[in-house]
Amino acid sequence: AILWTDGQPQYLTDGTTDALAYCIYSDGKDVYVGGYVQPASNKQGGIATIWKNGVAQSLTSGNTVAKVNAICIDGGKVYAAGSEKESGGRWKGVLWIDGVAQDFTDYVGTEVTGLYVKDGEYVIEGNMTETNSAKDICPYIWTSAGAQKVAETALCQGVGLAVAGNDIYVAGNEVAGYDSEYNQINIAYLWKNGVEQEL
């Protein structure tokens, strides 16, 4: 895992095991990177990790695979959203607040792609399948009030989140079909408060 500052690399791990960085967030002079590190003792595991100014903080034990996909700082607290693999290969959504985990989904297929926090209230954006099949994947947002499906169409996913005032924006795409050579064709969408706009 590497952080580049003005083009200069800073190695967050030593390369002896697999490690990936998925997200970055800056707060003043502090830079946070989120991802995962494969433990040397368990090649099937992955430790959800936050690096603050290059110093690693492990959020999980590494007994299973877990990762941090989005980070946000609010009120001096570090919020990290990601997912952890459960038995059967399904991913559950996890929100860590100052390192303390709380699940925001049940045992379903979940992938986080965005996080926003203000005054302790969070909005998490991602994709979820209730059957663990990619055929029914849909974008969702999660708040302290629960889950809300962004789009009803299957084979649809969100890839980015923005919040402005009371408005929640999700960018993503939907599988429209396949061309004559069976290449997948996607349509880009923007959802504002759940209302779809084709781009």
For the regions a language model picked out, list residue spans one by one.
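Residue-level hotspots at or immediately adjacent to binding/recognition sites across diverse folds
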Residues: 1-199
